[in-house]
Amino acid sequence: MSFEVIPAVDMKGGKCVQLVQGVPGSEMISLDDPVEVALDWVSQGARTLHLIDLDGAIEGNRTNAPIIKKIVEKCKPQGIYIQVGGGIRSFEDAATLLDIGIDKVILSTAALKDPELIKKLSDEFGSEHINVALDSKNGKISIEGWTKESEHTAVEMGSQFEEKGAGSILFTNIDSEGLLNGVNPKPTEELVNAVTIPVIASGGVTTLEDIVTLKNTGAAGVVVGSALYKKRFTLTEAINIISDKN
């Protein structure tokens, strides 16, 4: 499987936003139409879209559900793979998204509180459709929209969720997220080496060199948000630099 650069479309209040370290009210970027943003990434070469419902993650409501459905309707016919996270707290939440054509659901807090949920979803829908998000701050996993810290490390939880049937892991280094200060590859590399399922990296990408650095950890891909929206580089440039290195 080739390394993939995946643009993030984070939604809050019906808009596409980028937060600093996930903090509500810290919007660096706010664009009116997430559907247009998604289509723009597709036009630039995106094969996968990473959609995050921040209202779902922070407050538990599904106000962005109609937008997600519209993105699916516009992008799926073009063969685009869509993964969605944010506020998926139950089997029913995940099933609803998978039923409308989402390819992969991303669970975080719900998985940490009830690891058996991953097994149930994997048994029902197949592990390739189930991703667990591990968000690390100061070496420990954060939950509930990054507002609380757990006692567990990413390596501990990654191994546990692989056993439960997760098909992939999204690993975010919150210490770097949204700051545009560059990446620390070590935590990603440690997790990649601890599990056999694909790990998608996230957090802190600022330059094209950061993308190459994360590729070299053995990660399967990288989610990029702030750097693209701040025009540090284009998605096409990011895709091309990976192609050049393959």
Curated annotation (Swiss-Prot):
The active site is at residues 10, 135. The keyword Lipoprotein does not apply. Its main location: cytoplasm. Pfam families: His_biosynth. It catalyses: 1-(5-phospho-beta-D-ribosyl)-5-[(5-phospho-beta-D-ribosylamino)methylideneamino]imidazole-4-carboxamide = 5-[(5-phospho-1-deoxy-D-ribulos-1-ylimino)methylamino]-1-(5-phospho-beta-D-ribosyl)imidazole-4-carboxamide. It is found in: Cytoplasm. One of its GO terms (molecular function) is 1-(5-phosphoribosyl)-5-[(5-phosphoribosylamino)methylideneamino]imidazole-4-carboxamide isomerase activity. One of its GO terms (cellular component) is cytoplasm. The keyword Amino-acid biosynthesis applies. Its EC number is 5.3.1.16. CDD domains: HisA (cd04732). GO terms for biological process: L-histidine biosynthetic process; L-tryptophan biosynthetic process. Keywords: Amino-acid biosynthesis, Cytoplasm, Histidine biosynthesis, Isomerase. Pathway: Amino-acid biosynthesis; L-histidine biosynthesis; L-histidine from 5-phospho-alpha-D-ribose 1-diphosphate: step 4/9. Belongs to the HisA/HisF family. NCBIfam families: 1-(5-phosphoribosyl)-5-[(5-phosphoribosylamino)methylideneamino]imidazole-4-carboxamide isomerase, PRK13585.1. This is 1-(5-phosphoribosyl)-5-[(5-phosphoribosylamino)methylideneamino] imidazole-4-carboxamide isomerase. The gene is hisA.
